[in-house]
């Protein structure tokens, strides 16, 4: 997939909020490109949900991110929830 894409970010977020969202999106990328700890991904998802508590907003960000990267936030989080412990890798 093209590595030159823009992240779906809200410019009204604080620097700390932007860092939290980017951390989660980076963990999703790791799940597809190599592997990531399920606990790490779930932890960054919990912090992401503090910044983006709305399900509708989460889905919008997920759709935008998947359209530019090919990586699904939903599938990554579900894989982490199903694994709970250990590493997840969604790459083909």
Curated annotation (Swiss-Prot):
Superkingdom field: Bacteria
InterPro entries xrefs: BH2638-like_sf, UPF0223
Signal peptide: none
NCBIfam families membership: PRK04387.1 (NF003353)
Family: Belongs to the UPF0223 family.
HAMAP family associated with the record: UPF0223
The name this protein goes by in its record: UPF0223 protein SGO_1052
Species annotation: Streptococcus gordonii (strain Challis / ATCC 35105 / BCRC 15272 / CH1 / DL1 / V288)
């Amino acid at each position: 997939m093209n590595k030159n894409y823009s992240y779906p970010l809200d410019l009204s977020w604080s620097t700390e909020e932007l860092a939290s969202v980017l951390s989660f999106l980076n963990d999703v990328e790791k799940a597809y490109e190599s592997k990531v700890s399920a606990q790490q991904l779930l932890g960054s998802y919990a912090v992401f949900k503090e910044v983006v508590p709305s399900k509708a907003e989460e889905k919008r960000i997920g759709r935008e991110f998947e359209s530019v990267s090919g990586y699904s936030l939903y599938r990554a989080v579900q894989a982490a929830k199903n694994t709970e412990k250990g590493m997840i890798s969604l790459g083909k």
